[in-house]
Amino acid sequence: MTKANHHIFADGELSRKEGTLRIDTLEGETKYLPVESIDALYLHGQISFNTRALGLLNKHGVPVHIFGWKDYYRGSYLPKRSQLSGNTVVEQVRAYDNTERRLRIGHRIIEASIHNMRANLQYYSGRRGDFDSVVETLRELKTAVSDTQRIDELRAVEGDARKRYYDCFDSILEAPFRLAKREYNPPSNETNALISFLNGMVYTSCVSAIRKTALDPTVGFVHEPGERRFTLSLDIADIFKPILADRLVFRLVNRKQITTDDFETELAGCLLTEQGRLTVLEEFERSLDQTVQHPRLKRKVSFKTLIQTDVYSLKKHLLTGEPYHATEKWW
């Protein structure tokens, strides 16, 4: 059976009915969801669940990503790993603790991230504006990455690149959508809200991908380990945000699949409405399922698989020293 991400927006209760998940909504509806069909479960509503439901999800290796009020990401329940490797975790921590090894991996992550930002601007240069000078600056910043000798220097180069990249958004987006500047917690306008929501989806996709390996999601290389976040997921997400989040922002806005009516402004800032979230998620899942011909694998792979391939490449690098192939847009 082909597995897919499943999103639940209803409020209610999630329970186990033999080998199937049962959803009882507050409106009195009952739905059944075969657990074998789920790659990851996303809970967007106010859902209660018991240990029997978690046991079933754990047995089938299904992660659960939980979103709170107005779809703010709250955390993930990660089931017991199908792959356990103490050696992998040891090598991951050793690489983090070794400045040279950590920088080598960090360089590849940020080089790929800047490359993918630059690829977006190259695509829109001439279509939505003249971005040639920024494209050239991003090329220079990508080259400068390998010269950094400390993680804070590396992050400074990435921050400079991202600011210049975001400065081009207002030229790419159709009015009345504007970014002005990147703001979150809370998002200050519709574009910031859309970017934040999609960045969250990319992040949780990376959490799911890492869970399928023996890598520890809390040990990153660019982002410092913290108590409340999976820093390796943040690292991998930086590679894929331009590809999966930003390109979708441009497409949704410029094709008018999303309008200002899909947002609401409150004291908490500007946020997507429920209908807006449904529209965005449908397109995001469609994007994950799209395929490209992979030059190394010699076959078509989905973007969801591309994230998984990236993570496996990092794991192989840690264990064998083979080059880490951080994903740079080639198509």
From Swiss-Prot:
Pfam families: Cas_Cas1
Cofactor: Mg(2+); Mn(2+)
TM regions (residue ranges): none
Residues reported in the UniProt entry to bind Mn(2+): E158, H223, D238
GO molecular function terms noted in the UniProt entry: DNA binding; DNA endonuclease activity; metal ion binding
Keyword 4Fe-4S: no
Description of the deletion phenotype: Loss of the 8 Cas genes in this locus (cas1, cas2, cas3, cas4, cas5, cas6, cas7 and cas8b) leads to loss of CRISPR interference against plasmid targeted by this CRISPR locus, i.e. plasmid is not destroyed by CRISPR.
Catalytic activity, EC: 3.1.-.-
Similarity remark: Belongs to the CRISPR-associated endonuclease Cas1 family.
Further facts: There are 3 CRISPR RNA loci in this organism and a single cas gene locus. A CRISPR-Cas type I-B system.
Protein role: CRISPR (clustered regularly interspaced short palindromic repeat), is an adaptive immune system that provides protection against mobile genetic elements (viruses, transposable elements and conjugative plasmids). CRISPR clusters contain spacers, sequences complementary to antecedent mobile elements, and target invading nucleic acids. CRISPR clusters are transcribed and processed into CRISPR RNA (crRNA). Acts as a dsDNA endonuclease. Involved in the integration of spacer DNA into the CRISPR cassette. Plasmid targeted by CRISPR locus P1 transform wild-type cells very poorly.
NCBIfam families: cas1, cas1_HMARI
Protein's recorded name: CRISPR-associated endonuclease Cas1
Organism listed in the record: Haloferax volcanii (strain ATCC 29605 / DSM 3757 / JCM 8879 / NBRC 14742 / NCIMB 2012 / VKM B-1768 / DS2) (Halobacterium volcanii)
